[in-house]
């Protein structure tokens, strides 16, 4: 798909300012340059960044409200969805403190570079979230292409506290993952079909208890 068409598609679903588009273009350029040596995203998606990565990441922004003060991206990787959300928040003047947690030092270096270049209100932490001894808290948590659902649920149940909602991006196997997880967990959630694929979903969890 032509880049101009991708940007138009992005703007049709996520209405943003010209300044936001400019910032996302800068992010895109930094990503393409760094990807040559760091393998941040698959080569098959390098020409689909605006739809495959930016739009897919941005689709949860309208479900974050003014009462949410913080958002934590677990296993941020190349910055999806955390950096995309941070760029939109900056230009919408949303006072949301965003935290990116990533265990790879190389990816952390890239994330910090983007944050500095775009002057984003983002904290980047080089940590393996599974090895952090203390519990962590925050209003909103997001994960995309991180770990299987059952592992994410166990992580959140054992280590997260005082959270309001968790957004989890699920692919083609998501329906079966939810079915299997519901055998062990009492999950209160809303499910939305992804705007980028009818075979994918985004779930918003607001309650999580062990059965």
Residue ranges and their predicted role:
Residues 99, 173-211:
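Active-site capping/gating segments
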Residues 2-67, 72, 106-109, 113-120:
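Class I SAM-dependent transferase core
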Residues 112, 153-156, 179-181:
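Short amphipathic alpha-helical segments
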Residues 58-139, 143:
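Conserved SAM/SAH cofactor-binding pocket of Class I
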Residues 141-143, 165-168:
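Short catalytic-loop micro-motif centered on adjacent basic/acidic residues
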Residues 103, 169-173:
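Short strand-turn motif at the edge of the Rossmann-like AdoMet-binding core
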Residues 97, 121-123, 165, 186-189:
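Conserved beta-strand segments of alpha/beta enzyme cores
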Residues 153-166:
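A short glycine-rich, Lys/Arg-flanked "PGG" loop and its adjoining helix->strand segment in the class I
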């Amino acid at each position: 798909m032509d880049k101009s068409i991708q940007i138009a598609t992005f703007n049709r679903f996520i209405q943003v300012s010209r300044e936001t588009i400019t910032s996302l273009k800068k992010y895109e350029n930094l990503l393409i340059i760094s990807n040559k040596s760091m393998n941040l995203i698959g080569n098959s998606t390098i020409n689909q960044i605006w739809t495959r990565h930016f739009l897919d990441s941005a689709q949860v922004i309208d479900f974050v409200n003014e009462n949410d003060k913080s958002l934590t991206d677990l296993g941020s990787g190349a910055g999806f969805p955390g950096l995309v959300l941070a760029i939109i928040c900056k230009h919408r003047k949303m006072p949301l403190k965003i935290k990116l947690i990533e265990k790879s030092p190389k990816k952390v270096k890239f994330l910090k570079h983007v944050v500095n270049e775009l002057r984003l209100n983002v904290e980047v932490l080089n940590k393996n979230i599974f090895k952090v001894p203390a519990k962590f808290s925050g209003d909103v948590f997001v994960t995309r292409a991180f770990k299987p659902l059952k592992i994410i649920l166990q992580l959140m149940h054992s280590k997260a506290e005082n959270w309001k909602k968790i957004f989890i991006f699920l692919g083609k196997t998501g329906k079966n993952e939810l079915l299997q997880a519901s055998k062990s967990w009492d999950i209160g959630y809303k499910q939305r079909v992804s705007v980028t694929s009818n075979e994918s979903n985004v779930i918003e969890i607001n309650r999580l208890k062990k059965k």
